[in-house]
Amino acid sequence: PRVLIDVMTELIKPQLGDKCFDPACGTFGFMIAANRYVNAHNDMYALSDRQADFQQNKAFNGVELVHETHRLALMNAYLHNMNANITLGDSLAQSAKGLKDFDVILTNPPFGTKKGGERATRDDISFQTSNKQLNFLQVIYRSLKADGKARCAVVLPDNVLFAAGDGASVRRELMNFCNLHTILRLPTGIFYAQGVKTNVLFFTRGTTEQDNTTEVAFYDMRTNMDSFGKTRQLRKSDFDEFVAGYEDPSKRTGERWSRFTREEIAKNPDDSLDLGLIRDDSIVDYDDLPDPVESGEEAIANLEEAVDLLKSVVRELRALTEEK
């Protein structure tokens, strides 16, 4: 939703002269929000010719894989008076290897596996997995400028926080390369299909590639929250408590805020970051759920029974009509 894009952008605070990037840009929404933020916080008429040229032609960049969506991104940028660099291609492919040294990355990578399980072809990431989000995460933190200031906000599903194997390796590398300082646990059903659980990871690239994360703050916007959807849409005011604590750690009061040191995280199996959720006894444990195959077959049987019943009703109505 637009409100989440705006909140992420306002917390990352893109500045004049920042080179911004979205490696899975869709229709370019994040970069348009970044451009809007820069314009709102600066006197654009006071820029030098060099500054104006950079903002117009070099500041905002993106990559989009789908041809039709790429065309929409170009059109969207044009309508917002942005001569942006939007590449038609795959950020996980070798051809995108040169897209590096960005000051700001704002993105929402697609879910799923890479081409039905094919691994990323870039040779500059450490762990080439079939998990698209883990590959994108590696591309993202390796695409940030290693100056201690380059920063990112990225939407990722829960599995990135706890996946074993390469998932654990990617999390360790992320926390080594970057200061992963904040994780926002989002409500279900606001960004994707109902039931998909997502998070926003906020991190800053370090100047080194070792021990940059010392502590991670978590904010639980998921447990005991309203059910968001068509009848109750997400509002900017829903983020007020999170934004206040993000910008001023002294305001991180209340049960929704928690923090864990790197040493505490290391004690979790696979360096899991699946932390920071308030205990909610109303939530059913996954282990207690019925077998999904059996549940699916039962649902099919119930639907077939309902269809048969509906058919019989139609037959009876037709017979009554014919009698008249």
Question: Residue locations for each model-derived region?
Answer:
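Conserved S-adenosyl-L-methionine
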Residues: 1-107, 112-114, 123, 130, ...
